[in-house]
From Swiss-Prot:
It comes from the Bacteria. One of its GO terms (biological process) is DNA repair. Its EC number is 3.1.21.10. This is Holliday junction resolvase RecU. Binds 1 Mg(2+) ion per subunit. GO terms for molecular function: endonuclease activity; magnesium ion binding; nucleic acid binding. It catalyses: Endonucleolytic cleavage at a junction such as a reciprocal single-stranded crossover between two homologous DNA duplexes (Holliday junction). It is found in: Cytoplasm. Endonuclease that resolves Holliday junction intermediates in genetic recombination. Cleaves mobile four-strand junctions by introducing symmetrical nicks in paired strands. Promotes annealing of linear ssDNA with homologous dsDNA. Required for DNA repair, homologous recombination and chromosome segregation. Keywords: Cytoplasm, DNA damage, DNA recombination, DNA repair, Endonuclease, Hydrolase, Magnesium, Metal-binding, Nuclease. The lineage of its organism: Bacteria, Bacillati, Bacillota, Bacilli, Lactobacillales. InterPro entries: Resolv_RecU, Restrct_endonuc-II-like, tRNA_endonuc-like_dom_sf. The gene is recU. Coiled coil: none annotated. Its main location: cytoplasm.
Amino acid sequence: MVNYPHNPICQKVTPLQKQQKHRQVDFANRGMSFEAAINATNAYYLAKGIAVIHKKPTPIQIVKVDYPRRSRAKIVEAYFKQASTTDYSGIYKGHYIDFEAKETRQKTAMPMKNFHAHQIEHMAAVLKQKGICFVLLHFATLKETYYLPAKALIDFYQIDRGNKSMPLDYIRKNGFEVKLGAFPQVPYLDIIEQKFLGGDYN
């Protein structure tokens, strides 16, 4: 359950609180994974009526089912299948949003083995339909998070079909850093609003 501050508009903000608001927050220090931080961010967006974005369920291959009762089935063996698309999708201000989230402890690059061909194909299809598609890349050791447009990911992937790692320099050059916070933890919609809907990114 995510707790949100009550009546944020009515609260008086002091200079110190303003500084704290803009201070980067490391969600890992609070025992939260990158995925959990994104889920909490999406819950915040939903609660505030900002956007409706959800994590897609991981597909499961059912292998064995027992029927202890005629009217009740029990799955006793199943396996997670490889996801065929991306992690998250939804809608923001009438725009379709679709993205993947990846995390690494490496300091200089993001392993491309984390991305699969069918995911790249899915992202290309989303872009063809004018959807907003991207990846959120978190470098845990550096405590840095980046929004990388899907086109930049696809362009790099096509160089070697995902056999190498994507240098951090490439990500910094072609993406945008997401400043982590408290509410929401991973404010990626700020990038979309400023760089895409605002018309800065071409």
